[in-house]
Amino acid sequence: MSQYTEKEPAAMDQESGKAVWPKPAGGYQTITGRRYGRRHAYVSFKPCMTRHERSLGRAGDDYEVLELDDVPKENSSGSSPLDQVDSSLPNEPIFEKSETEIPTCGSALNPTTESSQSFVAVHHSEEGRDTLGSSTNLHNHSEGEYTPGACNASGVQNGIALVHTDSYDPDGKHGEDNDRLQLSAEVVEGSRYQESSGNTLFELENREAEAYTGLSPPVPSFNCEVRDEFEGLDSVPLVKSSAGDTEFVHQNSQEIQRSSQDEMVSTKQQNNTSQERQTEHSPEDSACGPGRICSEQNTNDREKNHGSSPEQVVRPKVRKLISSSQVDQETGFNRHEAKQRSVQRWREALEVEESGSDDLLIKCEEYDGEHDCMFLDPPYSRVITQRETENNQVTPESGATAGRQEVDNPFWNGCGDYYQLYDKDEDSSECSDGEWSASLPHRFSGTEKDQSSSDESWETLPGKDENEPELQSDSSGPEEENQELSLQEGEQTSLEEGEIPWLQYNEVNESSSDEGNEPANEFAQPAFMLDGNNNLEDDSSVSEDLDVDWSLFDGFADGLGVAEAISYVDPQFLTYMALEERLAQAMETALAHLESLAVDVEVANPPASKESIDGLPETLVLEDHTAIGQEQCCPICCSEYIKDDIATELPCHHFFHKPCVSIWLQKSGTCPVCRRHFPPAVIEASAAPSSEPDPDAPPSNDSIAEAP
């Protein structure tokens, strides 16, 4: 740390127009008066995020990034500034320097260098996508070919080094936010690498360059130069990971090697770093343009001036906060182009679905409504895409490491999953780490579901995320699969809004009855009906929506025809009608039985003869009914006796109207009241009293005549 503190006086002497560093709590801030105006910088330290958020850049909070700005050289020597760390930083060796510096600035990578380790650099712009392929070999070159230059690196305790550089180009079209070079070094621990590995991945989008460094030296980062060939030196480790800390070390030798076997460095703009620094470089040091990697400039001047130039000062630069949510809102999203690029990824996935590898690097970025996935194969076995073949900028690599030529399906699964999740609206694009971890394994589960039949379609059940959608077969084509992905997104969104359960509710109503359009179906109430044995049963067992068997009502009254025509009558009303009709049938049966009994009695008692009927005595009814006793009405016709009515008395002393009893005796020779027989003896008995003199009658003339 002593050599860092010695640089501060030189910094103030060289840049007299800049204020001394204030040291607020949590970060460093400075105000720089420059010809482009005052710019404020604030650097803070935050803990590093999880792997998913680091690799896919889904963090939603605003974050600060380290930035390096090109500062015009004020010394005549033109040497590039060197890294310096303030004494207030944590007291642990983060960066050591020596006479020999490793150049890490914009030099175009030589695509013709021999390599056993390769990387793919993909460039996205509004006009199209350019692919730059370059290979670097860290093991097959001799020592001492590193061009001296400035190497700016930052070490963090949690295994992530993040530097966000901004080349402030006043003549640029896109202003301050465009010409910037972003570097993020991520050390991912694994157990499959048994040897040092390194590769570099650059991505240029909207005049932005991102460098993914997995090289043994701190791979060309911001504003530094890289030779066409890198050498793999096996003496001193540059990056070492112990207890979660990463240390970047420049040794006094040109032998630099990455010796940690379980490390892998990926680049991504991060919002959480434990330590951040900002450095400034001269315009000559940065040659990054809108569509190219920083090309090598003034290499000879650098080599001459490096030894004689004094130590330079690294000054922080003011930078406005950048958040992924702001970028998502400001950048338009072009779904059509995104689908086309997704088709490219599916074609690549189909080619390598039989292979496997666990450690893969995925870099996904959004650019002008497009999002593409940049992948880096740790075994350095190249996968040539169709777009790369068309551009003729990438050639298949040979001599890949034995046993490391398989690409794992989970890599492609994660890549395709990113497309599916990213196609959502900007509001739902930012997922937490838990959502990523839950969604990644469920979208694409391997080749078993890829082999499903082409007739199958995507199905989404409400509220069941565990039901994974089945992909169409390879015969359906990648374009159809991509369209199905978009349909799946729409289904998920409507599912959250509650539309899918409503559709399923309509399906139930339509399938339950042919009369689903009738309004009464939704208000049908349960009712009960009588079966053939007069037992109550639930009509729901007969039909769900009043689709009953109308043959049960064939023998009912005519009113049921109306009920049959109007099927949406209240079921309770139908129940009452059915019950009443059953009771009526029972009454008719009872009456028929009684009639049958009466017929039997009539047959047993033959009718009386006409003579006997005519011989019945007749009585004239008086006003006081004294002639007929206490009877007030006729038992047959139930009519009251009135004056001057003719009544007849049977031998059983029951009085009836003469016409009524005559009709009855013609049908049955019994008394209607007591069922007593009316035999001919009755006639004889009636004739005998008629032969005897009536005591009440006046004496006859004979008796009167005999009296004298």
Curated annotation (Swiss-Prot):
It is a peripheral membrane protein. Pathway: Protein modification; protein ubiquitination. It is found in: Cytoplasm; Cell membrane; Endoplasmic reticulum membrane; Golgi apparatus membrane. The modification N-acetylserine is found at S2. InterPro entries: Znf_RING (IPR001841), Znf_RING/FYVE/PHD (IPR013083). Residues 550-570 are annotated as: Mediates interaction with TBC1D31. GO terms for molecular function: protein kinase A catalytic subunit binding; protein kinase A regulatory subunit binding; transferase activity; zinc ion binding. Residues 1-10, 333-342 have a biased composition (Basic and acidic residues). A zinc finger (RING-type) spans 634-675. Keywords: Acetylation, Cell membrane, Cytoplasm, Cytoskeleton, Endoplasmic reticulum, Golgi apparatus, Membrane, Metal-binding, Phosphoprotein, Synapse, Transferase, Ubl conjugation pathway, Zinc, Zinc-finger. It is an enzyme of class 2 (transferase). SMART domains: RING. CDD domains: RING-H2_PJA1_2. GO terms for biological process: inflammatory response; innate immune response; long-term memory; positive regulation of JNK cascade; positive regulation of p38MAPK cascade; positive regulation of toll-like receptor 2 signaling pathway; protein ubiquitination; regulation of protein kinase A signaling. Has E2-dependent E3 ubiquitin-protein ligase activity. Responsible for ubiquitination of cAMP-dependent protein kinase type I and type II-alpha/beta regulatory subunits and for targeting them for proteasomal degradation. Essential for PKA-mediated long-term memory processes. Through the ubiquitination of MFHAS1, positively regulates the TLR2 signaling pathway that leads to the activation of the downstream p38 and JNK MAP kinases and promotes the polarization of macrophages toward the pro-inflammatory M1 phenotype. Plays a role in ciliogenesis by ubiquitinating OFD1. This is E3 ubiquitin-protein ligase Praja-2.
